[in-house]
């Protein structure tokens, strides 16, 4: 930046810039030195200089801007070749696909984990229900068996009671039959005795029923 400002200032004021001699220009050959002339007097020198100035005015100094400055241009560095847009786009697409695949992989893993948890939870609950069912069935069957045992015991007791009742009824019936038989025997014996008495006395007994 400082070199550019210096070049600009030198180009704006060419009168102050001296033209450098080319580096490769060969030096001129030395001219032959003439024999020294007699030294002029100071008055002659002053007069000659004044006349020379009048006859030959100093020419206007013309400067060639093209030769005034020698600008050394730095080689322009070529920019690195940019990657094609398609390659960058493909890279972005691949990165997006990888990110999406990774996200989907995490989602699938989470889904499988949640499904596994749900399956295990359901299986555990089903196992608990099965165990509860078996426990309740076992309790009911034990209660039923106990009731059956109680019923069997009561049935035996009732059967024994019934047998005892039947035996008592049979005994009472036998007693009643025996009493009837005894009464019948007494009545028959009494009738035979009364009939023998009537035969002996010749008395006719009164009819006791209306069948005669």
UniProtKB/Swiss-Prot annotation:
Lineage per the UniProt record: Eukaryota, Viridiplantae, Streptophyta, Embryophyta, Tracheophyta
Gene Ontology cellular-component terms listed: cytosol; plant-type vacuole; plasma membrane; plasmodesma
Superkingdom to which the source organism belongs: Eukaryota
Localization of this protein: Cell membrane
Keyword annotations: Cell membrane, Membrane, Phosphoprotein
Major location (coarse): membrane
Biased composition (Pro residues): 23-41
One BP annotation, GO: defense response to virus
Descriptive protein name: Uncharacterized protein At3g61260
Positions where Phosphoserine occurs in the chain: 13
Keyword Protease: no
